[in-house]
Amino acid sequence: MQALSILPLKSGLLVGSRLEFELDCSCFVVSPKTTRKRLCFLEQACFGSSSSISSFIFVSSNRKVLFLCEPKRSLLGSSFGVGWATEQRELELGEEEVSTEDLSSANGGEKNNLRVDVRELAFSLRAAKTADDVDAVLKDKGELPLQVFCAMIKGFGKDKRLKPAVAVVDWLKRKKSESGGVIGPNLFIYNSLLGAMRGFGEAEKILKDMEEEGIVPNIVTYNTLMVIYMEEGEFLKALGILDLTKEKGFEPNPITYSTALLVYRRMEDGMGALEFFVELREKYAKREIGNDVGYDWEFEFVKLENFIGRICYQVMRRWLVKDDNWTTRVLKLLNAMDSAGVRPSREEHERLIWACTREEHYIVGKELYKRIRERFSEISLSVCNHLIWLMGKAKKWWAALEIYEDLLDEGPEPNNLSYELVVSHFNILLSAASKRGIWRWGVRLLNKMEDKGLKPQRRHWNAVLVACSKASETTAAIQIFKAMVDNGEKPTVISYGALLSALEKGKLYDEAFRVWNHMIKVGIEPNLYAYTTMASVLTGQQKFNLLDTLLKEMASKGIEPSVVTFNAVISGCARNGLSGVAYEWFHRMKSENVEPNEITYEMLIEALANDAKPRLAYELHVKAQNEGLKLSSKPYDAVVKSAETYGATIDLNLLGPRPDKKNRP
């Protein structure tokens, strides 16, 4: 609820919203003795769809006029309820006494209630451009309270109709000269005009007009100026109003300080706003400010503290959505808020986490998560899921797993999304382990999943099997395969292929045959990789007749041997010292229109060179160069060494310079 200001009047008490008094206000008169005899209801003071002011005027024969209005929303749109000219402590209600005779009907001079329709009156003036236009409408209206003009001017301002607002003031200035100063624009009229003209660069002109009319600005005027400069982007000029008010002998009030904080908000200067508040709090503690008895400063400071927390949150959110990386600023402001004793709410912490969407934001998200866990008893599950996603995006998978572990240990209970997010991170980690052959890491990840109640799926087991195969860890591959079956997962062709490869690299050819036969028995169709592995197994056993049968079987199933398949055979022959057989398979792959690559030539050249066939190795090297292949230095050195050892004559110029290891493609 808003604080209420209670001001004494001659006829009672004025009760109104402290923060929304001068403009967009709600107030009423409380009379301890008499009742209200005259009541005039002024409906809407503005006619646009974007604004609404409900207004009342209470009139009695012995009482002054009290104007009230109530808006649909705060002009600043701030949750703090700060109006840009929302307070006037020196409001002198009843400065212009309304004659009840003027409001009475012609029925025998009896005084009756008269309804003044401000909305209709303002609507009739909407096209006014000069004082003459206003006079044409108001000449038969008699004397109207100045509050009516204030309401209309504010309404024109909200509807961006500046010409009729200025025309009304010009008409009042004319009336002032005609009435000898009895009727004319006063401070409240000019404050209303100043507010209506904000955003149109007319502030200086209005101030000059006030000076010519001999009207001295008050604190509301300066508060309004501060907002005007802020909306025009003149932030330093807006903050300079604080010093100007003191120079003019006015003490800044809570609205002044709140508006200054809003300026820092518009500047997106969270540190500046926080430093301003800390300095303000120190001055209040020393009683250098807050001595105005018209305010409950203790209550106002509670609101200011809430407001600075809100501003810091908004600024940090703006920093996080910028294209630039402002994470360091966010962390510094969070630490500065801790030092100042300003702590955002849990909801604000969580909304900041939602604003963390880029990889570099993970450090901010992690810090905010830590603060929520330490300072609050609860945290939103959706926020935790977002953090798990963010950590994965930033490749901080272990940090994501820690958050998941917190959900299991501290709550809230993870849901299906939590599970899927963590499993997806394990997929990435296991895939990396598979590609790099980091088999121990893969096994560790599987154990971690099981420890946290996450059942590894088929693709997870396969990833670790492939990692074991690449690392030539035959024993580990066998254990993983068995564990996969024991956990109820049915092996796929990838599973069998990885196991076959591991067995082949461990030269466990008989075991490989048993696995192959079992795969066929359970109905798993071999793929190219599995056939290639078995080709390598048969080559290692030198069972070339079975190898021919295997290749025919591949052809019958529409699976064409690839360069990798022939390389596996040639490589197996080379390891067993069968360079002649390797050379035959080289010609066979050519006859089957499979083009050899660098690996093919390098393995075959080395096999021939080491098998006392330097001339043939030399010719293959030259052939590879002529085909545009870039061989490494290893076959080059093998050819040169073999030629020297066996006395072969070769042309080193044709071989060219020795390849650099760094230039190996």
From Swiss-Prot:
One of its GO terms (biological process) is response to light stimulus. It is a peripheral membrane protein. InterPro entries: Pentatricopeptide_rpt, PROP1-like_PPR_dom, PSII_mRNA-binding_protein, TPR-like_helical_dom_sf. It is found in: Plastid, Chloroplast thylakoid membrane; Plastid, Chloroplast stroma. One of its GO terms (cellular component) is chloroplast thylakoid membrane. Its main location: plastid. Disruption phenotype: Retardation of photoautotrophic growth. Reduced efficiency of photosystem II (PSII) subunit mRNAs (e.g. psbJ, psbN and psbA) ribosome loading and impaired synthesis of PSII reaction center proteins (e.g. J, N and D1) leading to reduced PSII activity and biogenesis, as well as reduced grana thylakoid formation. Reduced production of PSII subunits D1, D2, CP43, CP47, PsbE, PsbF, and PsbO, and, to a lower extent, of PSI subunits PsaA and PsaB. High levels of nonphotochemical quenching (NPQ). Keywords: Chloroplast, Membrane, Plastid, Repeat, RNA-binding, Thylakoid, Transit peptide. The keyword Chloroplast applies. GO terms for molecular function: mRNA binding; ribosome binding; RNA binding; translation activator activity. It holds the Pfam family PPR. PROSITE patterns: PPR (PS51375). The keyword Transit peptide applies. PPR repeats lie at residues 145-179, 181-217, 218-252, 253-283, 309-344, 345-375, 380-414, 422-456, 457-491, 492-526, 527-561, 562-596, 597-631. Interacts with HCF173. Belongs to the PPR family. P subfamily. Required for light-regulated photosystem II (PSII) biogenesis and grana thylakoids formation by binding to the 5' UTR of PSII subunit mRNAs (e.g. psbJ, psbN and psbA) in a light-dependent manner through a redox-based mechanism, and facilitating the association of HCF173 with target mRNAs, which encodes PSII reaction center proteins (e.g. J, N and D1), thus regulating its expression by modulating ribosome loading. This is Protein LOW PHOTOSYNTHETIC EFFICIENCY 1, chloroplastic. The lineage of its organism: Eukaryota, Viridiplantae, Streptophyta, Embryophyta, Tracheophyta. The gene is LPE1.
